[in-house]
Amino acid sequence: MQFKGTKNYISTDDLSMAVNAAKSLERPLLVKGEPGTGKTLLAIEVANALNMELIEWHIKSTTKASQGLYEYDAVTRLRDSQLGDERVKDIANYIKKGKLWDAFTSEKQVVLLIDEIDKADIEFPNDLLQELDRMEFYCYETGETIKAKHRPLIIMTSNNEKELPDAFLSCLLYTSDAADDLLC
């Protein structure tokens, strides 16, 4: 199934081609542009048009790449152990799955929106390179490797607040100035 835009989203031929190439070639798509030009809406409409679940990861200045994988709550586990809680025996009870974990373990291919990736610190994109390339990561606490059942269609957005690292950009299929390409 090809993306051609929707009744709620008029896509240019170039942008539709970029979305379809990202899907076919299984490469992340980066859409850059000014706030309010429809970058996030693109991911929503792509998911709707392709009948795929949308998983949204909204990035803030304090977001760490590891949060997209998982977070281990050692403090709660320590407290539970002091209170004699039976849950403490299974460390998995203290793992909060991140958006990449959810996307990788979904039973069907999903659209993963990594929204405003340029808001995070400069190392954030590079910290995701291996996971996005291999489509797997290791959870040290449980000793398991989380592998993607289906490679998600990854759409990243950037407001051009700061430059993204060259090593990261070289792994992307396409970048676009959304202000020129998007019509909403």
Predicted features along the sequence, with ranges:
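Single conserved hydrophobic/aromatic residue that forms the stacking wall/gate
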Residues: Y174-C184
